[in-house]
């Protein structure tokens, strides 16, 4: 096991791993522990009451956070005709078909999100081995394969996060930067949890959201008491 640095020992000493913190206390603790020399992201891990081995219990989707993620998102769109003009007007950095596919094949992928209209999937389908491993392959389940590419671009730019449970039934995503106001982080977390609960598989029984933990990029996880979140959650 790797030896913990003095900084990490100091950070971990501030967190009671047996306690679920009030959301405001949890956020304050994160900000106190964020001592890295860069602006750290605030990440969340949500343990779901699902059996991830069963395909009908897997959770996948996307939602727009009310205060965004704090990242400047570059968007590539595979489409043509009027949709291409609409995508450009919505702020997409790269728009095209075969020409855009050629850039991807050359390894020129200066973008964070890929969106495609249904008619463009014949082109995008050839790029699965490149885009797939990078988590960039468009998928209708997360709204990145859609006839309304302009709306998808706006959502991506506005701070849409995509989520998908891992093999242990845990969702990992980001809800902003440590420089966000406490209320902004709280509202982003609440928006994510509302979206997750709406996506609850009908076959999942019992408590759906079992545990919520937040952390900064270089910090320790802090468990959140869900009873201190908004009533809508």
From Swiss-Prot:
InterPro entries in UniProt: Ribosom_uL1_bac-type (IPR005878), Ribosomal_uL1 (IPR002143), Ribosomal_uL1-like (IPR023674), Ribosomal_uL1/biogenesis (IPR028364), Ribosomal_uL1_3-a/b-sand (IPR016095), Ribosomal_uL1_CS (IPR023673)
PROSITE patterns on file: RIBOSOMAL_L1
SUPFAM superfamilies: Ribosomal protein L1
UniProt keyword annotations, A-Z: Repressor, Ribonucleoprotein, Ribosomal protein, RNA-binding, rRNA-binding, Translation regulation, tRNA-binding
A GO term, aspect molecular function: rRNA binding
GO cellular component assignments: cytosolic large ribosomal subunit
Entry keyword annotation includes Repressor: yes
Gene Ontology biological process: regulation of translation; translation
Domain of life: Bacteria
Gene3D superfamilies: 3.30.190.20, 3.40.50.790
UniProt keyword annotation of Oxidoreductase present: no
Family: Belongs to the universal ribosomal protein uL1 family.
NCBIfam families the record matches: rplA_bact
Protein task: Binds directly to 23S rRNA. The L1 stalk is quite mobile in the ribosome, and is involved in E site tRNA release.
Subunit relationships: Part of the 50S ribosomal subunit.
Name of the molecule in the record: Large ribosomal subunit protein uL1
């Amino acid at each position: 096991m790797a030896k913990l640095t003095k900084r990490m020992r100091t950070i971990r000493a501030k967190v009671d791993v047996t306690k679920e913190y009030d959301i405001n206390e949890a956020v304050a603790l994160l900000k106190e522990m964020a001592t890295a020399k860069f602006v750290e992201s605030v990440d969340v891990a949500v343990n779901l009451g699902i059996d991830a081995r069963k395909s009908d219990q897997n959770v996948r989707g996307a939602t727009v956070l009310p205060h965004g993620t704090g990242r400047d998102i570059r968007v590539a769109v595979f489409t043509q005709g009027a949709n291409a003009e609409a995508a450009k007007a919505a702020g997409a950095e790269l728009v095209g078909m075969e020409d855009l596919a050629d850039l991807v094949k050359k390894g020129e992928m200066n973008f964070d999100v890929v969106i495609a209209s249904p008619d463009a999937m014949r082109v995008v389908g050839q790029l699965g081995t490149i885009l797939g491993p990078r988590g960039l392959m468009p998928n209708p389940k997360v709204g990145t394969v859609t006839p309304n590419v302009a709306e998808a671009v706006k959502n991506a730019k506005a701070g849409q996060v995509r989520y998908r449970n891992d093999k242990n039934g845990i969702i990992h995503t980001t809800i902003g930067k440590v420089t966000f106001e406490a209320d902004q982080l709280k509202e982003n977390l609440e928006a994510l949890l509302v979206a997750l609960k709406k996506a609850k598989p009908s076959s999942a029984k019992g408590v759906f959201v079992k545990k919520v933990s937040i952390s900064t990029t270089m910090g320790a996880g802090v468990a959140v008491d869900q009873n201190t979140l908004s009533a809508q959650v």
